[in-house]
A protein has these predicted regions:
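Flexible secondary-structure boundary motifs
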Residues: 75-152, 162-175
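Charged alpha-helical initiation segments
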Residues: 1-63
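Polyanionic, low-complexity intrinsically disordered segments
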Residues: 16, 32-46, 124, 141-235
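Non-transmembrane, amphipathic alpha-helical segments
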Residues: 55-65, 117-120, 154-157, 161
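Short, hydrophobic, well-ordered secondary-structure elements
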Residues: 59-83
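Short N-terminal helix-initiation segments at or just after the protein's N-terminus
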Residues: 2-12, 71-76, 103-104
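Amphipathic alpha-helix face/heptad-repeat signature
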Residues: 10, 17, 62, 69, ...
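A broad detector of short, well-ordered amphipathic alpha-helices
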Residues: 19, 26, 30, 68-71, ...
Length: 235
């Protein structure tokens, strides 16, 4: 089963959110769901991003959705690890933040110091959950015509950042899975292949400058006029 088809019903919650995060990351890089299978093949075409302000904002939305789903995948992953190793520890460890769980749980339950504070995965998890909090606490703000149409969010939620954070979540999930006698969750391996294949696309998508409010309004006026003209011709 491919990533774009989702995951089997028997898969755990972590796999569901990880799969969704991968799909949103691909969309943020301008890759449609129908092309996900091809990403894991050696021969890949060049990156093609749809032009325009609206397309930019769609990719930004997909980056934000990737961040939200990656955070849910990370939390479900470490909770699944704790429950599978020592269910009686859940109450104690539930008092910790998700990055703290990733750091402490492997040491406590498996004697493995995988994600100490300062490590790449740990620091990316801290950043991931800071961004998640920012998204769920967002407030609208007035913008002038020359201001970025995204309110400056592409500086924090662009495809490159979403890619980095999702990669760390997937690698963290793989490391926790490898602590078992038989590594579990094959979806993690597939997700890592797709994430690796999206690296250059994420960089290219993140390099596109944010449109201004005026540019977005001009594009919307043009599209509205074109739609009206098409309707009149067809009448």
């Amino acid at each position: 089963m491919s990533v774009r088809d989702g995951v089997p019903l028997a898969a755990d919650t972590a796999d569901v959110w990880l799969g969704k995060a991968v799909v949103h990351l691909a969309a943020a890089c301008g890759v449609p769901a129908s092309a996900l299978d091809d990403l894991t093949k050696p021969a890949l075409g060049g990156t093609r991003l749809a032009p325009g302000a609206r397309a930019f904002l769609v990719r930004l939305d997909e980056s934000r959705l990737c961040v939200l789903c990656a955070a849910l995948a990370a939390e479900a992953t470490v909770n699944d690890y704790i429950h599978s190793r020592r269910p009686s520890y859940r109450g104690m460890l539930d008092k910790l933040s998700v990055p703290e769980k990733f750091s402490l749980a492997p040491r406590l339950l498996s004697g493995a110091d995988l994600f100490p504070p300062g490590s790449r995965v740990y620091e990316h998890l801290v950043r991931l959950f800071a961004l998640q909090r920012e998204l769920v606490q967002a407030w609208p703000h007035p913008a002038a015509p020359g201001d970025p149409a995204d309110g400056g969010q592409s500086e924090r939620f662009n495809p490159r950042i979403a890619h980095e954070l999702l990669e760390s979540v997937a690698r963290g999930a793989k490391a926790l899975g490898d602590l078992h006698e038989h590594p579990y969750r094959p979806t993690v391996g597939l997700a890592l292949k797709v994430v690796d294949a999206l690296a250059k696309r994420a960089e290219a998508a993140a390099a596109v400058p944010a449109p201004t409010v005026a540019e977005l309004e001009e594009e919307e006026e043009t599209l509205t006029a074109a739609a009206f003209a098409e309707e009149m011709i067809g009448a």
